A protein has these predicted regions:
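Short glycine/proline-centered loop/turn elements that form peptide/ligand docking sites
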Residues: 84, 88, 109-113, 130-135
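Short hydrophobic/aromatic beta-strand or adjacent loop that forms the aromatic wall/cage
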Residues: 42, 137-141
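Acetyl-CoA-dependent GNAT
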Residues: 7-77, 88-95, 145-149
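Residue-level recognition of the GNAT/N-acetyltransferase active site
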Residues: 75, 79, 107-109, 134
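Conserved GNAT acetyl-CoA-binding A-motif
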Residues: 95-105
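Conserved active-site tyrosine of GNAT-family acetyltransferases
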Residues: 117-118, 122, 142
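Conserved catalytic-core motifs of GNAT/GCN5-like acyltransferases
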Residues: 103-105, 123-138
Length: 151
């Protein structure tokens, strides 16, 4: 599959918002996506095909030396082709260089995402009961530590 990772810009917003709405039970609004473009504490990455189409995207929030993986999403027809791994890999490379850790929440029944995160060194550190109340599912909290945080 031919694609490249690029920083998200305004040209991606419509496709990203549509994909987000199709894939998530709590999608972000178009306005939220646009405001994230101008948020200095967020890294937005798009996997873009040669024609500029969005195959997937990722969002990493950063405060000081802490990262929060907010979203990784890939079009259903582009899954199992390394797109999510490439997006996550870009965030992990940034994390190794600049962060103490990256944390995330993932729905307990999202087996592909759980496998991806575990394969990349994330470990389960907790659970939020009924976090996804609309589908009665828990969130699994996971972290990948790059260096110990000292108070």
């Amino acid at each position: 599959m031919d694609y490249q990772l690029v920083p998200m810009d305004k040209s991606h917003l419509k496709e990203v918002a549509e994909l987000d709405k199709a894939l998530f039970t709590r999608p972000w609004s178009a306005d939220s996506w646009e405001s994230e473009l101008y948020n200095d504490t967020v890294s937005l990455v798009v996997a873009e095909d040669p024609d500029g189409g969005v195959l997937g995207y990722g969002v990493l929030g950063v405060i000081l030396d802490e990262g929060c993986l907010e979203k990784i999403a890939v079009r259903p027809d582009c899954r199992r082709k390394g797109v999510a791994q490439a997006i996550l890999g870009s965030f992990l490379r940034y994390g190794e260089e600049h962060l103490a850790y990256i944390g995330l929440e993932v729905r307990e029944d999202n087996s592909p995402a759980l496998a991806l995160y575990e394969k990349n060194g994330f470990t389960a550190v907790g659970r939020r009961k009924n976090y996804y109340a609309e589908v009665h599912k828990d969130a699994i909290l996971m972290d990948k530590v790059f260096r110990e945080v000292t108070p």
